Amino acid sequence: MIEMTETDLQRKHTGISEIREIVGIYEIDIEDLKYSPLKIKVIQILNASGDSYIGIANLTIKGKGCSGYYRSMHPQKTKEEALDDAVDGFFAYLSDESEIKVVKNW
């Protein structure tokens, strides 16, 4: 647990705009998926308005008829909700006709 708060760090170092902590990395095996496992990195964002969590997938997906690749990264209140959001966002576009790309420097 970090004892120093974001405000303490920002007072010391004015160039800090955001602090993130990696909460966990989850690997999800998906049947018949060439790029399996789907990996989700859940980070906690520490800021003055309260902590939030974001799930970040190592894969982006382009569904049939979509113009671009997608991965859900909406701030959530809990790490479980962040994991759910990232996985749900991936499966929302997954089909036999989807295109998938691995994210470099994930």
Regions found by a protein language model. Name each.
Residues 24, 33, 51, 67-68, ...:
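Intrinsically disordered, low-complexity segments enriched in small/polar residues
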Residues 44-71:
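Short aromatic-glycine-(Arg/Gly/Cys) micro-motifs in beta-strand/loop hairpins
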Residues 1-38:
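Negatively charged, low-complexity tracts enriched in Asp/Glu with abundant Ser/Thr
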Residues 37-45:
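Periodic aromatic/glycine/histidine/acidic cluster detector
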Residues 3-10, 62-106:
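Mixed-charge, Lys/Arg-enriched low-complexity segments
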Residues 24, 29, 43, 88, ...:
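N-terminal non-cleavable signal-anchor helices
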